[in-house]
Amino acid sequence: MNKIVRTLLVGAVLATGGGAVALAAGAPDSSVGTWTLNLAKSKFSPGPAPKSVTRTYAESAQGTALTVNGVAADGSPISWQATFKYDGKDYSITGSPNYDTLSSKRVNASTVKSTQKKAGKVVGTTTRTISAHGKVLTLSSKGKDAKGIAHDDVAVYDKQ
């Protein structure tokens, strides 16, 4: 094979697989930053919707640190934290009445699937998608809350 053809072939392989290689090598997490719930674009079933929620993702030596703060529909505070990796293993959540562990796995550069557990039992699943322009984060969640009430929510967040 001549040198030009080989160079073109290597370039094509890198162009098509480069994203996967960068992702596997620990590319920057596109969720990093502060995200505010857009109530007008979100749907909470059966509801009611929270009054406000802010999610902050930060990179740390231990993985991705997530802090969630807000105000529930009844006026009570929402505040929980977790530090996790996208490796499918369970990581502790502190402060949530609904979950005590979280496991997450990347589907692709913009999508993550997560499972939430309480006392070792799966109580929720979430798909997190970040828009192509990186300014909208959507969480599609199904599961049961601490009272056993089923929910099917789509929460849309705007990057700040």
Where are the predicted features?
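Generic secretory/membrane-interface signal
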Residues: 9-11, 20, 134
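C-terminal segment of classical bacterial N-terminal signal peptides
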Residues: 15-23
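Bacterial N-terminal signal peptides that target proteins for export
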Residues: 1-12
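Hydrophobic small-molecule pocket/channel-lining residues, especially in calycin-type beta-barrels
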Residues: 4, 23-160
